[in-house]
């Protein structure tokens, strides 16, 4: 196959989206944008990106940020392990590299939360290094371009695609080339629905287009079934109209984040909820059920039963705090898993 770079780059320079991390592609900006975009659409991530940079304009500021403020800046993006790893990496960068990301692929790859793709994006876009940056968009483009039925989630297949990506990469324009492939996959060689082949600069070279197999590609491994977990969520409110929050364990699902009272296992009845509250030293003065809800994580689905409970005046149990509505809005971060109950909390 002839080299795709000339046609691809010509298309990219004419059609690329104007994005803040492209107009000012400092290593920190590219790093932050790539972490945010791992599980979030560009349009949804942009307001968070701007707000985050306004509060934490450089790596030392990120490294020094208090945990609650950091979580609050990330609130709404989900997958909070991303921002925890972001801060862990920032602290290492401050300790070992003077607060500036290293211009070295392997050194970037060694930082928490930075994998092959993110290291390649930073290294090529910000530092001009001739390295690959292969994400799902790029794998899809090359799967169709070569009409390759390989399962792209398999490591050996991904390595083979990466080698093909590098065969076409112009070393002096590595960052632009990598971004162009990502952009082509995002705007033209799209994942859902028919690809926009008539707009593609590589249409004349695309083997899947000739074979009529573009809609069938790429091939992925079948996803694992999610585990269903019933949980009971309790919005406990005291006489001062404060809500009880408990902090989750520092490891595992939603690590270290705040949540309403929650019990895992079979859905609890109102009587069982009151009994558990009394065991915590909280008197159940009134209780009413809330609508059932669910939340899907990558590997777990919560089926939530909810109750709103008035408990009068009481000390917060161990591991819990009372939080006013104002504090809930400005200080504490509740994960998106509790979206169905946020209106009741005044959020």
Locate predicted features.
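Intrinsically disordered, low-complexity, charged terminal extensions of DNA damage-control enzymes
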Residues: 1-18, 23, 186-347
